[in-house]
Amino acid sequence: MRVYLISFFFTAIYVVSLYTFPVARPRPSLNRNDPKVITARCISVLLASSVCCILTRLIIGPSLNVFTFPTDQVLKSLLHAATIFIGPLYEVWIVDKEYRLFFIHLKDCLSNAIAWRNIIIGPLSEELTFRCCIVPICEAAGWSRLKIIFVAPLLFGMAHIHHTYEFLLAYPNAYIAAALQTVVQFSYTTVFGWYTTHLFLSTHSLFPSFLVHAFCNSMGLPTLYGKIGNRNQTRIYYTLLLLGVLIFYMTWGITDFNNHQDFEPRLVPLN
């Protein structure tokens, strides 16, 4: 039971921290893309994830160092994640020819608060809290690998439900839209959490899950319907989209790493 309480506590620390600063608190006129709101929330979640890291170390001891960088496993994780985006990558690089503007886009991202939130601070703070803290706590409680992969990410999905409250403040009567948004967001964040939890359990390093998270956020959700360029390009895109899913499944084994560090969690009475 204690493992659930600690995990919920860490989740609460993370979510509540978003509203620490008055400028970032929910209100009908709140614009979450306002640079001041983004800055306040980025500072808050970094502090929250740091607190969770300290508490985790106190609970399970110093036996795990999540800040090592296993280069081979990082590259394989990124390559595996990229397979499911073969279609979107074709759209960006071939159809839209975004490679011509790569350095311009890179410069814009480095000076754009939204990009920093979505691609760097958000993934970093979330992976620290929901993978590097909650997952080792579950391991220390003696949970099986399968249970950790499928249960722990539910908290990651729940942590995004607060967006529903903000949505209803802006659109008070849009209950159906809010419910749909909640279900969709909870579903895809939980499923994504299954994958990054698998990566973390396979490496016990922050970086594979963080960099995969950052990459996926930069790509966004793939286009699932509609025209992509001309007719031939549309056919190629959807063919590659399906092929990417197949390759992702067939190459799953490249992410079944032997842990690059021997982590023996100090079993503590958390159940």
Swiss-Prot record:
GO BP terms, alphabetized: CAAX-box protein processing; peptide pheromone maturation
Membrane-crossing segments per the record: 3-23, 42-62, 174-194, 236-256
GO molecular function: metalloendopeptidase activity
Cellular component GO terms held in the UniProt record: endoplasmic reticulum; endoplasmic reticulum membrane
Enzyme Commission number(s): 3.4.26.1
Bilayer topology: Multi-pass membrane protein
Compartmental location: Endoplasmic reticulum membrane
Domain of life from the UniProt record: Eukaryota
Keywords: Endoplasmic reticulum, Hydrolase, Membrane, Protease, Transmembrane, Transmembrane helix
Main location: endoplasmic reticulum
Catalytic activity: Hydrolyzes the peptide bond -P2-(S-farnesyl or geranylgeranyl)C-P1'-P2'-P3'-COOH where P1' and P2' are amino acids with aliphatic sidechains and P3' is any C-terminal residue
Site (Transition state stabilizer): H213, N217
Active site: E126, H160
Family: Belongs to the peptidase U48 family.
Function: Protease involved in the processing of a variety of prenylated proteins containing the C-terminal CAAX motif, where C is a cysteine modified with an isoprenoid lipid, A is an aliphatic amino acid and X is any C-terminal amino acid. Proteolytically removes the C-terminal three residues of farnesylated proteins, leaving the prenylated cysteine as the new C-terminus.
Name of the protein in question: Probable CAAX prenyl protease 2
